[in-house]
C-alpha cells in the first residue's frame, strides 16, 4: 500500500442501453442515462484504479459522494469515466471523477473511499444478522 499516492488515474466506459436508462431503473421517467448508472461507473472506475496498489485481502468501499449530473445522454452513446486520486489520508482516499459522452462532459464531482480488510469488514457485516 505504500506505493499508493495522489495522481493514480483510472478510466472505464460503457454503452447506454435500455437497462441503464432512468425510466427502466425508476430514477426518472425519461429514456436517458440514469444518474445511478453514472455514479456506479464512477465508483467502479475509482475502485479499479487503486486495486493494484492494495495489500492482498483488501478492498475499498465507497463512503461519500458529491456528484453533479450535468447533461443527459441517449441510448446508444458511449459514456467514458475518468478518475484521479487527489487525496490519501491513511486508509481514506478521495477521487476527482468526471464522466463524458460523445458530446462532452456529463457529470463531475468527488468520491471518498476507504481501504478495508475484506475479512474483518465482512465479519462486522455478518454480525448484523446475528443480532
Model-flagged regions — what are they?
Residues 67-102:
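Hydrophobic beta-sheet segments that form the core/acyl-binding groove
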Residues 114-131:
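C-terminal output/interaction extensions
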